[in-house]
Amino acid sequence: MSLSPEKATELKQIIHEQLTRMDVHGKIRAVLAETLKDEFKTDSQHLSEEDLMMALRQRGVIEDVVNELRFNEEHISRNFTSTPKPATHFIDTEQRTLKKTNIDPMRRYLHLQILGGKAFLEHLQEPEPLPGQACSTFTICLHFRNQRFRSKPVPCACEPDFQDGFLLEVHKDNLGDGSRMADATTMLSICDPVQLILIKLDTTGETTLVASHFLEWRSVLESETGTTSLAVELLGVGAECKVSVGVLNVKLELYPPLSKILSQEIVKTQLSIERQKTAEKERLFLVYAKQWWREYLQIRPSHNTRLVKIFAQDENWINRPVCSYVRPLRSGRLLDTPRQAARFVSVLGFEKAPVVGGGGKQEQWCTLLAFLCRNKGDCEDHCNLLCSLLLGFGLDAYVCVGTKGKGVAHTWVMTYGTDGTVTFWESLNGHRYLHKPINPDAPPMVEQPKCEYPYRLIGCIFNHQCFLANCQPSDSVELCVFDLNDESRWKPMSEEAIKSVCSPGSTTSLPPFPPLCSSVVDAATESNDLELQLRFLVSEYRKDLGLTTVWEDHLSYLLTPALASYEIERTTGICAGNEEFQDSIRRAVPNGHTFKGFPIHFVHRNARRAFATCLRSPFCDEILSCRGDQIRLAVRVRVFTYPESACAVWIMFACKYRSVL
């Protein structure tokens, strides 16, 4: 078998990883030491290569290595450079592509290994999955200092078989000698934790946030061996934040090892000082917030009923200032425009925080990593992300807290233009609305602007630097004047007070913001797979009705421009290409025939769920159960990918038939 240089390198790396896992070097050293001691003690001190090989053969080391490295035909024929298709329902048994990593010899690295789990008691009775059988899986997502990793999915079990390692670069960006290798003292001053998110994926493709944990890694600085092992207990989220989910076996190791370690007392003292400083800053901010709130109520007693939200609970039920949930976030080359950012946020799934028992809405503002890894969240999560992205694009953006129709609590995003233009952004669908206030004192003959937005009341607005409470006589959005510099209309909080607890690095309890990740979804492959599944479902549906199904591939292909046009319109607000689509359909449908089409949009890739939703539409059902002469059916699926593997899925069902009436 001849291999290209690239594939040969990949193969060498796989063999190297296998040898490392088997600890072959350690075995060779042990054999060498034993051979030198026992067999060559009285002979000459020269040990030849043949002597060593004979000793290795006698002890079975070489045979073990050969057996471990024996590749079957499937492994030989596999293309090592292709990226395996990520599993959605089934366990991914394929060997992952080994990515080449440029390791800077002048940098320090933290090797974090997750070596299994235990006491995941919710899955105590979980049966062992059969090969190829669909089962629920666990995945661990990790973030540390702008570096993100994701573990291989493993079957849910009482003792899940996590076997993953992550190489984390440890350095200080803001130091003048940032190119130098970080020593123990420098690393001790790096207070960023390693955030671990545990996600469960069930057999229907639904994701659940199981646990969110912040790992303090600096205990490795006091280890004489440069390694330390930890039993990390994961707690639940929301109402279950005090309940243990399970325990992860974690091993930390520094590369290269420290030449000088720190004493346990120094590390303990540093962590204690950081906690004390954080607690003091948070205490002072709470004292200030209480005083500010008393002043706000003195303006007008009715302010007590307004939605002025200063603090919000995260997934671990920790109270944080709302300003800490927003920060300018640049998407690199993943998103090009603010409107594209709004479209991306809108295709992330919407799901309210689960409530145990009855009662009102469960409050849970997720940290950004938890929201992105789960790929869905409540409207507050969407708004915080959208506001952060708009700030990253240089806009003056704020999150608005208020209500929409029927008094339902809601949040949305507002941008304030340099010319005073106020634009509302709905994070759940990407819609934009211009705000023009109504003047209640205007004469009856004066035409007032019509409000197209669904928002009714507004209590406060905030971003990473500002918090402003609405103190106008009415908190109605349509009457609101957004002159943010007028303190008679908007009562501000001290920017210094906000900065003391919300700016990056101000407190050790503040979760760092992760970068966005590019999509790993192959749009063409996913589109084709969904289309084939829908064809099968339609054929079976018509078969149950006693109808035959004839597909026309050309008609299906002609539906593509329409789906592309719909997505462009959602992103830019501009409708383009409709004339060409209509002209092509007219040419494809003969005289005397009728054409019907039904487009629909989803943010998931579950064919059965999508098909069940489509059948609830009478118009779609009319197409799928169409009876007539010379019936030809068509279906087209177009998957549009966005960062974080979010997808906008457009489906169009169509039919053409000869009219007999």
Give the residues covered by each predicted segment.
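Intrinsically disordered, low-complexity regions enriched in proline, serine, glycine
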Residues: 121-126, 150-154, 177-180, 205-209, ...
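Eukaryotic beta-sheet cores, primarily in C2 and C2-like/PH beta-sandwich modules
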Residues: 112, 137-142, 163-217
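Secondary-structure boundary elements
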Residues: 286-378
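C2-type phospholipid-binding modules
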Residues: 124, 189-263
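Acidic, S/T/P/G-rich intrinsically disordered/coiled linkers that flank
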Residues: 1-139, 143, 147-149, 190-192, ...
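Eukaryotic intrinsically disordered and solvent-exposed regulatory patches
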Residues: 95-100, 123-128, 150-155, 167-171, ...
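His-Asp-centered catalytic microenvironments across diverse enzyme cores
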Residues: 229-238, 246-255, 264-298, 373-374, ...
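Short proline/glycine- and polar residue-rich coil/turn motifs
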Residues: 155-162
